[in-house]
Amino acid sequence: LGSLMKLMVMDGQGGGIGAAIIKGIRSTIGLDIEILALGTNSIATSRMMKAGANKGGTGENAIIQTSLTVDIITGPLAILMANSMMGEVTAPMASAVTSSPAKKILIPLTQEKVRIVGVSSEPLPHLVNQVAQILMEMQ
């Protein structure tokens, strides 16, 4: 069990993107990866747990502490942006994710007033498949 890659999936609000990522990873990689669901709120964490995460944590301190111990962090781009997700992502959360030594695989979906040039707008299922593909290549 100690050799499993540790993946932190972070999301906020309703947790839909995080849940989709977890379902996609479980359907492609299966149980060969440890998935930690980190929500900015309990609804997001709960939804990600139901999608198949191994463990879950909620809130600023859980996100800060977990970001130091995982191999990879994934979630929507907004997890890097302080005050995003209607203020749910605090500056310390965004800083912890950004500063973490973990590799980051981010989904370029955001409701913020940010647009990433050179990134095509693909539907979420396609983006989730790309995340799973990258993770399989990293194993």
Region locations from a protein language model:
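Glycine-rich phosphate-binding loop
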Residues: 55-93
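SAM-dependent methyltransferases
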Residues: 1-8, 27-29, 69, 128-139
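Glycine-rich phosphate/diphosphate-binding loop of Rossmann-like nucleotide-binding domains
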Residues: 5-39
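N-terminal beta-loop-helix "entrance" segment that forms/cooperates
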Residues: 33-57, 114-119
